[in-house]
Amino acid sequence: MQDFPDYVGYYAIKKYRYPGTPAANENNRNLLLFRDPSVDGLKTGHTDAAGFCLIATAKREAPGVGQRRLLSIVLGASSENARATESQKLLNWGYTAFDAIKLFDANQAVVTPNVWKGRGSQVKLGRMAPIVVAVPAGAGGRIQTQVARPEPLVAPLNRGQAVGALKVTLDQKPLVVVPLLVLDT
């Protein structure tokens, strides 16, 4: 989805009529497309060995974050309806049991350390995209962040250059380590 965003819309097509054929439509086998407006794909499958399978993806509004995408994967279901029902349960659980927390906006300085031998005396470090983490619902207040970076910072530094990292923890357990990039020079 990130590598080929131009194709994402194809997975949400509910019905398709092959050009040059009679007026019969081919329905998408992902039943969630017909049940939940937040679902926009992705892949169904069935074999005797694997049963009915579905990778479903949905986008819903997340307070303070914007659109939040989740994926569910169901393997070995007994029917098309069962795979859709179980996928819907997983998506609903994911959206209610976990909060998306935006720690920093795109291009927001996480830290502004001093820099030696540069045009300016300081440089902003952050990310070009927002820094967002998922945590159990209600746990956002227990997130901690720590910046690790080399000392001292010496020019030249280039925009987009990785200079250190932001370590994010929840209850002293690591969640993610995000490389910090030079936002300006």
What are these regions (language model features)?
Residues M1-T185:
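Domain-terminus/edge residues, biased toward the C-terminal soluble/receptor-binding domains
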